[in-house]
Structure formats: structure tokens, C-alpha cells
Amino acid sequence: MIRGAVYPVDLGDAKRGHEQRGRRLGLVISIEQNAWSTVTIIPTSTSAQPAVFRPDVVIAGRDTRILIDQIRTIDTAYVTGELVDCLSRDDMAQVEYSLSRYLGLLRLQRSMGSSL
């Protein structure tokens, strides 16, 4: 799997909580050198509510929100189809910034100063 690539994924049929479920597109954010049978993805939605941690991008010609708050690691068996699209560098930078902000890594980086 390629970081920044978008694939169809099946997130199952969980009936509780607010987790995304069912078949949808997922953005791969794990590194390419990951030799495990899992991949870390961020689900996408064309109808989710906007939020500062849900960047808007265009995937396969459709306006799409990247649901940073729904990040998860799945078995590669749940990747159900072929490559749909790849995000541009600018779009990936926007996703990475939103992810860092959502996880509080920007504050951590600032508090550690230049020691990173």
C-alpha cells in the first residue's frame, strides 16, 4: 500500500457509537515500508459535517472530507478493491497538518522546541 493512496475499504457493520462503518474510501497514511498485514487508514465521506480536523480534498473528481477523527488500523483483507486515486503533495500536507493538530502533536513539537 502506498501512503497517500485511496482504496475502497470495508469497515464492517458495527451498530454502536459514532464510528464509520460499511464500504467507503480510505486514505492510506501508514508508511510504505510497513511489511505487516495491516494498514492505517483514514475513512472519507462526501456528506460528513465540516470540522477543522476534516480537510476537504477532491478524490476521483468528488469533493470529499478526510475524517481525521476516525483514523484506524485495519487488516489488509478489508481493502476491497483497486487503487482509486492518490492525493497530491499539497493535499497530503493538509491531511498531515490536520492529523498533527487533532492528535495534539503540534503543541508537543512546540513544547519540545528544536530538540525534535
Where are these regions (language model features)?
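Conserved functional hotspots at enzyme active or ligand-binding sites that engage polyanionic ligands
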Residues: 1-116
